[in-house]
Amino acid sequence: MSDETTGSLGDAFSPMDTPTTTIMPPPADVDESGFSHSLLTFAAVMTFLIMIVGICGNLLTVVALLKCPKVRNVAAAFIISLCIADLLFCALVLPFQGLRFVQGTWRHGEVLCRLIPFIQYGNIGVSLLCIAMITINRYVMITHYSLYNRIYKRHWIAIMIAACWLFSYGMQLPTLLGAWGRFGYDARLQTCSIMSDRHGHSSKTTLFITAFVIPCLVIIACYAKIFWVVHKSEQRLKRHATKQNSIPNNLRPLAAATSMPSGDGANPSQVPAGCRVSSDSSSNYSTDVPDTTPGGAGGGAGVKQQPSRVKDQREVRAKRNEWRITKMVLAIFLSFVICYLPITIVKVADKDVEHPSLHIFSYIMLYLSACINPIIYVIMNKQYRKAYKTVVFCQPAARLLMPFGKGNGASSAAEKWKDTGLSNNHSRTIVSQMSAGATATATATAAAGTQPQSTSTQGPVQALELTARVPDLISKSSNLPLPQPLPQIPPAGARPSLTPPPPPSVLTATHSNGSGSQRLPLKKNNHSYTNSGFNSSVISANPSSSPSPSSSGGGIYRPGIGSMGNGSASIRRITMVGDDIILEEEELPPTPTASSPPQMQAPPPPPSSSRQTTMNALNTTPKTPIYMNVDSPKRNQSYSERNIPVPAREGHDQGVKDSQGLPSKLMDKKKFPKD
């Protein structure tokens, strides 16, 4: 080749025209690893925020579960272990991870670079194993209840919790010592993690399968079995409810009387005796309580009692509580899987860190799993919310969580009554008591000139309707009758009805024959109303004599004074706790069985003159009695103001008092009870 040719080629490819490859520098807001500064700042803020919420929430949960015995059960022991693992994760791991995001790299030495991932992966394993243990506990409780008490004893529970911690951290020891993989700094992710050793071995896959995949499969299998058993149980309950005519949610008279003479002369109905309590709440269940009145007079042995279902109601309520905890644990497991799933997918799909934002998001989700559990407890469990209140507001645990215990003015018997399945938020309760005894005629019937009839198939019925929001009225004297509206004069030949309608929104206690109406006091300020025997009545030995208000159930009901009957009672106390009505059932010592009263024939109908006298007496307007509000008496009253005697009515009331020969019980009690 000539020199000209060579020169032309050299001119054609001058150094200035030679193509070169230029490497652009990274942007100013991106570090050498590819993570932007704004992204690292966001990750640091979220990490420190999760750390604060996690430490406060998990510490509050541990203190609340240890302080409040109401929520202290087998599941709570594993939940405490879970909270301790999350607390250690938030207190020991997250501060260093937050500083890593702020500084952009790891600057805390090689020892901490090995220790921090050891604690991190160990706590992750403990958390998932504790969730698996709680799920197994729910599985045994719901599907194999007969084995529950034998498996979950205190020493076995301690062994299970210790096994979770030892297994999770024991699996990390070979990696910590460098025998099977090693803990070191990963420059691509700028974090300390599990690295391959000099032989190329790593424990990531084994730890992932052993501490994550297997517990998840066990949890899924247990919940599948739990849902199957619950579904079958609901199907059986629906079939049983269809056969037994499901109980409606509204109030209705659940207990019926024995054979009673009706006001219009209709044939009486035969219903067995017993006592049933039904609450107007969201529950469709009622509780049957057998009549505990000992030895009713007059054919009481032949009356059958209603079967008791208190034990069934306790079992239903316990199963509902267990199912509520089971759903809460399921929510914890789902949140755990959702939080750990992103980092698992990102590390497998993006090994070369081509999308840094996905890695930051996966780390934040991983840290979020340590603080989300207390939030689930607050949302899904009412008892846990109350337990948190006891710690936050420094309230006694017994007063808030055990409103029917000694801390709130009620007795242990009332707490046992609540365990029968009655709802806490019921607004109205009907209590009907059947007594297998002789029939007690009302005062108005005796005043009309008729004599009480007693047969072996007739029994007194007394019903109480307790309304949680009614005026608290009480008469100041037991000799003053309550105001009653004037009855309408019936047409000629018809039997007059002596049943005055009860005043609206006022607590009443009436006989089933409608012979009288009586207002009862009701107090909301956690006051207990004792009853000395209003559930049964006693017939006077002389059939011709008119029964007194005390013996016929016509007296004034007063706190601490049982003037509505002299017989034995099955319900001894009515306690108001907030808006709840607690009925305390108490066994009484047996009393001798009274002899049956003599059988008497029905008297002939009264002559027309006597009937006209009765009608004139009914048309007479009684004196207006004096009432006072028990809830708001005058404060700091003097002795004379509290004990102003009220004159008794002339005529009938004075005669009744003289015939009894005893002073009024209301006048004996000089002071009204304090609020």
Curated annotation (Swiss-Prot):
Database matches in CDD domains: 7tmA_GPR84-like (cd15210)
Chain segments carrying region Disordered: 258-316, 475-568, 588-675
Gene3D superfamilies recorded: Rhodopsin 7-helix transmembrane proteins
GO BP: axon ensheathment; behavioral response to cocaine; G protein-coupled receptor signaling pathway
Keywords assigned: Cell membrane, Disulfide bond, G-protein coupled receptor, Membrane, Receptor, Transducer, Transmembrane, Transmembrane helix
Gene: moody
GO MF, any single term: G protein-coupled receptor activity
Keyword Membrane: yes
Compositional bias ranges of the Basic and acidic residues kind: 666-675
Membrane topology field: Multi-pass membrane protein
InterPro entries assigned: GPCR_Rhodpsn, GPCR_Rhodpsn_7TM
Role according to the record: Required in glia to regulate the acute sensitivity to cocaine and to continuously maintain the proper blood-brain barrier (BBB) function. A moody-mediated signaling pathway functions in glia to regulate nervous system insulation and drug-related behaviors.
Transmembrane segments: 45-65, 74-94, 116-136, 157-177, 207-227, 328-348, 360-380
Disulfide bond annotation, renumbered to this chain: 113-192
Name this polypeptide is given: G-protein coupled receptor moody
Organism, as annotated: Drosophila pseudoobscura pseudoobscura (Fruit fly)
Chain ranges on the Extracellular side, renumbered to this chain: 1-44, 95-115, 178-206, 349-359
Subcellular location: Cell membrane
Residue stretches of biased makeup (Low complexity): 278-294, 536-551
SUPFAM superfamilies reported for this sequence: Family A G protein-coupled receptor-like
